[in-house]
Amino acid sequence: MLAFCRSSLKSKKYFIILLALAAIAGLGTHAAWSSNGLPRIDNKTLARLAQQHPVVVLFRHAERCDRSTNQCLSDKTGITVKGTQDARELGNAFSADIPDFDLYSSNTVRTIQSATWFSAGKKLTVDKRLLQCGNEIYSAIKDLQSKAPDKNIVIFTHNHCLTYIAKNKRDATFKPDYLDGLVMHVEKGKVYLDGEFVNH
């Protein structure tokens, strides 16, 4: 009986250790949380989410020409050549897991150029509402999603929009770099923030 109890205790101890290791392993991959408190959602996790419901991914535009010493693509209010390369690389990785999506951008040169290089030929719809970064952006997202309820959506917008959404939805301080993104979805007329997109 004593031997059985010892064996049982050892089994429980090993089980707890395994659970802890599994949790640590998970935190090293797609299950990790960012230091800002947002869940980190990588490409594979995003693809799994998209199988459950259509996702809305909002990206900050690529590197601005007027705030960089790198070569401009063309217009000074647009993005740099490096920005185009970064956007194309991100788009290729994203499309490998989420090939089917509708593409939108705000009506600025830098977001339009970023979306164009990201998509590699996909039709782009420019919507000036995506420049508005208060509660209005939720109305715009819901409207876009209602036009094609079963489609994933990619939106190119601005850092202050992403910062506002993270704070408003999860009380998180999010200071996005170029091409950083947030993952959202619409359910029963409400917009939910799932986490921060991490390109892996």
Swiss-Prot record:
Location in or out of the cell: Periplasm
Q: Does the keyword Zinc apply?
A: no
**Source organism's superkingdom?**
Bacteria
Q: What is its main location?
A: periplasm
Secretion signal: which residues?
1-25
- From its record, what is one biological process in GO terms? lipopolysaccharide metabolic process
Q: Supply the InterPro entries for this chain.
A: His_Pase_superF_clade-1, His_PPase_superfam, LipoPS_heptP_Pase
Supply the EC number(s): 3.1.3.-
Q: Does the keyword Hydrolase apply?
A: yes
Q: Extract the Gene3D superfamilies matched here.
A: Phosphoglycerate mutase-like
Q: What sections of the sequence does the record tag as coiled-coil? A: none
CDD domains named among the record's database cross-references: HP
GO annotation, cellular component aspect: periplasmic space
The molecular function terms of the Gene Ontology recorded here are: phosphatase activity
Q: Identify the keywords attached in UniProt to this record, alphabetized.
A: Hydrolase, Periplasm, Signal
Pathway(s) annotated for this protein in UniProt: Bacterial outer membrane biogenesis; lipopolysaccharide metabolism
- HAMAP family annotated for this entry? Ais
Role, per record: Catalyzes the dephosphorylation of heptose(II) of the outer membrane lipopolysaccharide core.
Which family does the UniProt entry place this protein in? Belongs to the phosphoglycerate mutase family. Ais subfamily.
Q: What is the name listed in the Swiss-Prot or TrEMBL entry for this protein?
A: Lipopolysaccharide core heptose(II)-phosphate phosphatase
Source organism of this protein record: Escherichia coli O139:H28 (strain E24377A / ETEC)
